[in-house]
Amino acid sequence: MAKRGKKYVEAAKLVDRAAAYSATEAVELVKKTNTAKFDATVEAAFRLGVDPKKADQQIRGAVVLPHGTGKVQRVLVFAKGEKAKEAEAAGADFVGDTDYIGKIQQGWFDFDVVVATPDMMGEVGKLGRVLGPKGLMPNPKTGTVTFDVTKAVNEIKAGKVEYRVDKAGNIHVPIGKVSFEDAKLVENFKTIADTLLKVKPSAAKGTYMKNVTVASTMGPGVRVDVSTLA
């Protein structure tokens, strides 16, 4: 295990590891314990009582955070004809069809999110081995395979985040930057928590939200009382 820096160790002393803080208190602590010299991202981590190995307990989707993430997302849209024009008008950073497939195969990745119209997925599917491991493959569950490219681009630019449970039952989601007002971080935090509660698989047994923590990029994790996220 990597040795923690002096600043991190000092910051961690401010957090009671045995306590579960309210969402508001946790956000305040995250700011106090942030040791980064840049505007660090604040990330929420949810440990869920699901078995991702079972198809009916896999959780994946997307939600628009009311105050965005603080990051400007570069959007690539695979579309042609009128849909390509709509994507450009909506503010997509890159719009094209097969020309971008060749660029990506050659190692071009100057984008953060990929959207594709359903009729383009036959071609985009060729990029599965490249985009899949990076979490960039368009998917209907996250609203990135759609003919409504205007809505898709607008939502991404407005602060839409994707969530997906990993093999251990965890979901990590950015909820903003340390420069955000406390109230905005809390509202974003509650929005993603509420979304995850709504998509709870009916097959999941026992406690659903087992543990929730929030932390800045280089700061210690702060445990959150789940009841304060309602």
From Swiss-Prot:
The keyword Repressor applies. GO terms for cellular component: large ribosomal subunit. Keywords: Repressor, Ribonucleoprotein, Ribosomal protein, RNA-binding, rRNA-binding, Translation regulation, tRNA-binding. InterPro entries: Ribosom_uL1_bac-type, Ribosomal_uL1, Ribosomal_uL1-like, Ribosomal_uL1/biogenesis, Ribosomal_uL1_3-a/b-sand, Ribosomal_uL1_CS. Pfam families: Ribosomal_L1 (PF00687). Belongs to the universal ribosomal protein uL1 family. The keyword Cell cycle does not apply. It comes from the Bacteria. GO terms for biological process: regulation of translation; translation. Part of the 50S ribosomal subunit. This is Large ribosomal subunit protein uL1. Binds directly to 23S rRNA. The L1 stalk is quite mobile in the ribosome, and is involved in E site tRNA release. Protein L1 is also a translational repressor protein, it controls the translation of the L11 operon by binding to its mRNA. Gene3D superfamilies: 3.30.190.20, 3.40.50.790. GO terms for molecular function: rRNA binding; structural constituent of ribosome; tRNA binding.
